[in-house]
């Protein structure tokens, strides 16, 4: 089940990014006093009272040359589309503005839980000034100071009350996967081809997908799949669906819900920076990854074309050397019959458990081939290894000093483990731990 989502909305320069960073617990956005400067990440995760959740800062979604009020309106609509709970941020220093009233009207009609956070209430004397915000019709205003961290806990206490119930059980036998990629790489056509039906409206114009609906289906062998459709940008999407940060955000949410990610590239266009950014997030999240090169039927080929394209992918995605690459065409159905089987294989590899005796044989053989490094005269000693988790496979290696395990040596051990066992399509984690 996906994490509950909080969206932070409000006009520019009310302190949305400061509150976003406070909730996330780290300073991950660039924050200045000039309106409209939020850059970098607009989507992250947080935790409060034992509940994990996702956070969206809608102010980070650049809507280009749209008029000021239209931008604010559409950011509020994004929040309504994406969030379980909305935090509406206003400024206690400036009072209610026309832009605040516009956002309040949109949110009031949404039937989503809205928490009104009056920011920049930096001292107790200012608390008496927040009563005017009752006029927005959104219930009790919460006085907060993003810069000092005051009142944030009260806002989160209220947010958690509105989170959806997490008692829903998921079918462990169902493989959940998503197709992610830039607009116009052919995600919708691939979905239709995999399902064998015209479930999604498809055209050659970027951003024509109308909706995002998850789909269950079974293979001929009886394996259950849940396809998480990220192609859709909702009916309002024509305004902002090609906005890079918005589409990246949607991809991140899909990755969060998936076991396996199909990273779709356009054979005609090659690899773009956005592809690398989203693939990096899937890798860091520990998801299984398959690289799908679509529209292969449109490429002029010779005997080296596929090999050259694969070499380019390996060069651009060096950290995904474990991910299988498949060249397909949604139009001609080329190699599409191999996708479900490949997804099943990656799922099996994600769940693979290695007996400790076998694992330690491989690790000790690796040390014999390439002795452990030294640092300032002190040598790393490896005592034993054990697997502690799957999805992704995670190995704890007990050592004398954790700091002596350099990244390069951990990578060497990972490569030796991969040579010995089948982990195609899944990242694996190596965690050094000091033996007590």
From Swiss-Prot:
Pfam families: KH_dom-like, MMR_HSR1. Residues 4-167, 175-351 form the EngA-type G domain. The keyword Glycoprotein does not apply. Keywords: GTP-binding, Nucleotide-binding, Repeat, Ribosome biogenesis. GTP 1 binds at residues 10-17, 57-61, 119-122. GTP 2 binds at residues 181-188, 229-233, 294-297. Residues 352-436 form the KH-like domain. GO terms for molecular function: GTP binding; ribosome binding. GO terms for biological process: ribosome biogenesis. InterPro entries: G_ENGA, GTP-bd, GTPase_Der, KH_dom-like, KH_dom-like_a/b, P-loop_NTPase, Small_GTP-bd. Coiled coil: none annotated. GTPase that plays an essential role in the late steps of ribosome biogenesis. Associates with the 50S ribosomal subunit. Belongs to the TRAFAC class TrmE-Era-EngA-EngB-Septin-like GTPase superfamily. EngA (Der) GTPase family. This is GTPase Der. It comes from Enterococcus faecalis (strain ATCC 700802 / V583).
């Amino acid at each position: 089940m996906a994490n509950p989502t909080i969206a932070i909305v409000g006009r520019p320069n009310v302190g949305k990014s400061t509150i976003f960073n406070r909730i996330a617990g780290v300073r991950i956005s660039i924050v200045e006093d000039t309106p409209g400067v939020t850059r970098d990440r607009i989507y992250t995760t947080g935790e409060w009272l034992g509940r994990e959740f996702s956070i969206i800062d809608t102010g980070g979604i650049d809507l280009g040359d749209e008029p000021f009020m239209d931008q604010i309106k559409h950011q509020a609509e994004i929040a309504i589309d994406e969030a379980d709970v909305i935090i509406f941020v206003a400024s206690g220093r400036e009072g209610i503005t026309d832009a605040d009233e516009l956002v309040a009207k949109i949110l009031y009609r949404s039937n989503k839980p809205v928490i009104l956070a009056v920011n920049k209430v930096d001292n107790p004397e200012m608390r008496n000034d927040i009563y005017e915000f009752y006029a927005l019709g959104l219930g009790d205003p919460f006085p907060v100071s993003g810069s000092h961290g005051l009142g944030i806990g009260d806002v989160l206490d209220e947010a958690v009350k509105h989170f959806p119930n997490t008692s829903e059980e998921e079918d462990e036998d169902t493989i959940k996967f998503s197709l992610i990629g830039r607009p116009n790489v052919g995600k919708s056509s691939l979905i239709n081809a995999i399902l064998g039906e015209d479930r999604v409206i498809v055209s050659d114009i970027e951003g024509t997908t109308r909706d995002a609906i998850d789909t269950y289906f079974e293979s001929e062998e009886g394996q259950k799949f849940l396809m998480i459709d990220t192609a859709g940008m909702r009916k309002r999407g024509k305004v902002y669906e090609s906005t890079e940060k918005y589409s990246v955000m949607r991809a991140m949410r899909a990755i969060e819900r998936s076991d396996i990610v199909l990273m779709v590239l356009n054979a005609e266009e090659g690899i773009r920076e956005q592809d690398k950014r989203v693939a990096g997030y899937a890798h860091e999240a520990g998801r299984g990854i398959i690289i799908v090169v679509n529209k292969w039927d449109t490429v002029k080929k010779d005997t080296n074309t596929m090999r050259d394209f694969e070499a380019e992918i390996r060069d651009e995605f060096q950290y995904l050397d474990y991910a299988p690459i498949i060249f397909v065409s949604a139009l001609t159905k080329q190699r599409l019959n191999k996708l479900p089987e490949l997804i099943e294989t990656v799922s099996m590899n994600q769940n693979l458990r290695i007996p400790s005796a076998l694992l330690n044989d491989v690790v000790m053989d690796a040390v014999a081939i390439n002795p452990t490094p030294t640092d300032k005269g002190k040598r790393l000693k490896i005592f034993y290894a054990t697997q502690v988790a799957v999805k992704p496979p995670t190995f704890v290696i007990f050592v004398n000093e954790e700091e002596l395990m350099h990244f390069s040596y951990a990578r060497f051990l990972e490569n030796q483990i991969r040579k010995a066992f089948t982990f195609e399509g899944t990242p694996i984690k190596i965690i050094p731990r000091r033996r007590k």
